[in-house]
């Protein structure tokens, strides 16, 4: 029996390599609301983690795929976390890789200022599409951006309007309370990459402590699905398999 994994990814984290999964898992991906091939709804000017999680739950339910294992990266990590909290019935187990929990950091303003300066420089250089490139080079590294397929780079850059004008600035305040996190019973793994910025480690440690799990490290950057796909799958495969 093949296991099902759904990937909940941030707009800047698409393009997860499928081959390392294909021997054992059926992998489902989707374009989040207003990104890539998912049309932007009329009048849609803001979003929330709750809306994003509701979308993912509705997809799994409509396709009769629940419960499924969930892998969430970056903004997708907090979407997956909200699935665990409000839609536990659609998730069999979850891997949360570097969820963007800015509000739990000791100095969230410093992190937001750094990211803001990167985005502002990109906007000044060429608007939202150029800002996407600046942002991904900052988050994932120059090598990762440079080796992406040109068509994928273009598609990701085209999401700049949604990323910067709808999503960014709305997700960063997301912070479930301790009691809510302690009530999660679905098996969950918290993951960080070895080459990522320290604030990802800080947020992961905060979350793992409240879920009563250990932080697991994987090689690579904020986007290990690009630079270390086989190592990423090797790291999380035993957990995704679950009990025999």
Regions found by a protein language model. Give the residues of each.
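Conserved HGGG/HGGXW glycine-rich cap/lid loop of the alpha/beta-hydrolase fold
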Residues: 1-40, 45, 59, 238
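Short beta-to-alpha linker loops that shape the active-site pocket of alpha/beta-hydrolase fold enzymes
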Residues: 31-35, 100, 219-221
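Conserved catalytic-core motifs of eukaryotic protein kinase domains, centered on the activation segment
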Residues: 38-44, 106-107, 201-202
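Conserved acidic catalytic loop of the alpha/beta-hydrolase fold
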Residues: 50-68
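Conserved hydrolase catalytic core segment
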Residues: 66-108
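Helix-rich cap/lid subdomain of alpha/beta-hydrolase
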Residues: 99-154, 168-170
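Conserved serine/cysteine hydrolase catalytic core
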Residues: 155-211, 216-220
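Catalytic active-site module of serine/aspartate enzymes centered on a nucleophile-bearing elbow/loop
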Residues: 210-244
């Amino acid at each position: 029996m093949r296991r099902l994994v759904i990937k909940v990814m941030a707009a800047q984290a698409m393009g997860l390599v499928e081959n390392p999964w294909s021997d054992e898992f059926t992998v489902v991906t989707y374009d989040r609301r207003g990104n890539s091939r998912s049309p932007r709804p009329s009048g849609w000017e803001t979003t929330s983690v709750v809306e994003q999680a509701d979308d993912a739950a509705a997809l799994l339910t409509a396709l009769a795929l629940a419960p499924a294992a969930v892998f969430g990266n970056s903004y997708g990590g907090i979407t997956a976390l909200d699935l665990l909290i409000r839609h536990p019935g659609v998730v069999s187990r979850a891997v949360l890789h570097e969820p963007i929990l800015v509000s739990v950091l000791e100095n969230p303003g410093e992190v937001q200022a750094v990211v803001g300066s990167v985005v502002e420089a990109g906007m000044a250089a060429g608007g939202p599409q150029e800002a996407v490139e600046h942002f991904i080079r900052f988050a994932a590294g120059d090598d990762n951006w440079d080796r992406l397929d040109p068509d994928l780079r273009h598609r990701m850059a085209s999401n700049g309007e949604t990323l910067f004008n709808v999503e960014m600035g709305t997700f960063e305040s997301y912070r479930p309370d301790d009691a809510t996190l302690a009530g999660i019973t679905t098996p969950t793994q918290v993951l960080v990459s070895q080459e990522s910025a320290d604030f990802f480690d800080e947020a992961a440690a905060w979350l793992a402590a409240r879920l009563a799990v250990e932080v697991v490290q994987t090689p690579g950057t904020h986007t290990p699905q690009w630079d270390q796909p086989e190592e990423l799958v090797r790291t999380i495969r035993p957990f995704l398999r679950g009990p025999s």
